[in-house]
Amino acid sequence: MIWKQPPRRMGEMGGSLSRRFGNAAASWAVWRVSRSCFSLLFFFYFFLFFSSSSLLPTTNNYQHLQLHSLIPTLNTTAHLPHQQASSASMKASLFLACSALGLALATPTQDAPETVNNPLGIVYQAKLPETSRTGIRGTINATAHSSGRGVVFNLDLWGFDNTEGPFRKLHTCFDQTNKQTNKIVKLTTTTAYHIHVDPVPTDGSCGPTKDHLDPFGRGQTPPCDDSLPQTCEPGDLSGKFGRLTTSSMEEHFNQTFHDLYTSTRPGLGTFFGNRSIVIHHRNSTRLTCANFTLVEQPGTSTTYVPRPTGTGIISSIFPTGTGAISTSGHAPTISATYTPTPTPSPPAQNNGAGRLVGFSLGAIMAALVPLAL
């Protein structure tokens, strides 16, 4: 007797096999597409790394740092075994979509240009006020370098040996007779200070000063690399020249430095004459702050400086040469020799093409996500 399978059961078995082989084929196809997209995006990033600045004017050191962190991830996940094709394809598509959209939506940034033609003889000063929040007092003076290239800052701060605060701590001790004594212990810590965007209001609160002076959209992460100061926020002075450190503090803390990326010329985004400086606690809260005011101007009386406008991009003559800064006393003595050399204007910082490519990649990669699910 020949056994015959009912047509209904045969249909179910055929459908099951069809679904099994169909899903396997679909997984294989999605895996191949995802791997191809990995390769495409890898070569796109490779092109960003090695293209000349004339082709990609917005590809600067800061963007290279961000893109470089993505390459190891791409290289590792692009060679998964075939057995993991289904889950890998989904993760790959999601990662590619997010990374491409993140690249597209990122705020356009550029390295800060050196400031030139800063007016000579003008001095801006920020004087830290008397406040119950901290005993830190002092002044920060700023004037253009004698070459007109950048700004020389001179810090004279004191009050770090107050009873309580970020640099000292009050310890209660007991001697052999059980007599209580108080001892001030010096803490090993560092404190940041920055130029902030807005001035301090009349009530003296440091909160409304907003964020650091950052006209080029760099942001606070990753942290400033002092070996590449042009990639830092122009207002991040402690990031570029070092924090206030207790190990070097006695009665006064004095420091003089030449910053090439801030300006005393009104109208530029890097102008700080109507902004503020903020000193932070070691836990990043704002300890004290003060406004910069014009205290010296050659040949004229002190006048109000209007709020700056513009992008801070400089197109002018860039002097070359060396300068020497002396830190004797509270007023810096600066000498410099330089020869102005005309150079071409920097290229226009237009990120439209890069953002268009990013959005296109993001759309393509996002379309792969439903295939992987």
Curated annotation (Swiss-Prot):
Localization terms from the record: Secreted, Cell wall; Secreted; Cell membrane
EC category: oxidoreductase
Induction context: Expression is down-regulated in presence of human keratinocytes.
Membrane topology: Lipid-anchor; GPI-anchor
Entry keyword annotation includes NAD: no
Cofactor note: Binds 1 copper ion per subunit.
Gene Ontology MF terms in the entry: metal ion binding; superoxide dismutase activity
Residue numbers spanned by region Disordered: 329-348
Lipid attachment site numbers (GPI-anchor amidated glycine): G352
Keywords: Antioxidant, Cell membrane, Cell wall, Copper, Disulfide bond, Glycoprotein, GPI-anchor, Lipoprotein, Membrane, Metal-binding, Oxidoreductase, Secreted, Signal, Virulence
Family, similarity comment: Belongs to the Cu-Zn superoxide dismutase family.
Protein name per its UniProtKB record: Cell surface Cu-only superoxide dismutase ARB_03674
Provenance organism: Arthroderma benhamiae (strain ATCC MYA-4681 / CBS 112371)
Lineage: Eukaryota, Fungi, Dikarya, Ascomycota, Pezizomycotina
